[in-house]
A protein has these predicted regions:
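Transmembrane signal-anchor/signal-peptide helices with a preference for the extracytoplasmic
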Residues: 1-18
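Generic secondary-structure boundary/loop-capping signal
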Residues: 4, 39-41, 156
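Hydrophobic alpha-helical segments involved in membrane association or supramolecular assembly
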Residues: 5-6, 24-25, 29, 147
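Signal peptide-directed extracytoplasmic domains
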Residues: 42-67
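Soluble extracytoplasmic domains of inner/organellar membrane proteins
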Residues: 58-59, 63-176
Length: 178
């Protein structure tokens, strides 16, 4: 059979990219499912006049999100998984790489995931600041399949909340020139 003939020419790089694509798909699906609840991660506290005074992050909601994503990833990333590589990549002919019908490869993945949150304030203009909460998912995976041994590291980030805080714009600015 053609696929068995070409399996010996599957490079470690091709196996690594196939595993990487599978992992990214799993991470994106886990994050999307966890975010479907529509939780609010940030609350802006305002003064009686309506001006922003403080920004509060809902740590309980972030911890629930973390637990949901990591739980889903633990279920989907470990064990026997099937990835697909283009048949042309099995021929050893550079011109055909990346083309052709998909040929399934079975990988025995062992993976671990870590999830962290980052919060930052960045300038968004004159007397404006942008508060952003970002989630970073990092996955380290290893395929112990005898024929398709590979190791890969994947990181992806998702912006969970972004709030622009607007203050009063000064009517006049003094510039010091040298």
């Amino acid at each position: 059979m053609f696929s068995e003939w070409g399996l010996g020419s599957v490079s470690e790089e091709l196996t690594q990219e196939a595993a990487r694509g599978y992992i990214l798909s799993c991470v994106n699906q886990a994050v999307e499912e966890a975010l479907e609840e529509g939780s609010t991660f940030v609350q802006v506290e305002r003064s009686e006049g309506g001006e922003p005074m403080a920004v509060h992050t809902d740590t309980a909601a972030l911890n629930r999100l973390r637990a949901q994503v990591l739980s889903k990833l633990e279920k989907t990333l470990n064990g026997s998984v099937t990835v697909k590589v283009p048949a042309g990549s099995l021929t050893g002919i550079a011109l055909l790489n990346g083309h052709g019908f998909p040929v399934p490869l079975t990988l025995r993945l062992e993976a671990s995931a870590d999830l962290s949150f980052h919060t930052e304030f960045v300038s968004a203009g004159i007397n404006q600041s942008c508060h952003r909460v970002t989630m970073l998912v990092a996955v380290q995976a290893y395929s112990q399949s005898k024929r398709f041994e590979t190791q890969t590291h994947v990181e992806t980030s998702t912006v969970l909340a972004e709030t622009v805080l607007v203050g009063d714009v000064p009517e006049m600015a003094l510039l010091e020139t040298g």
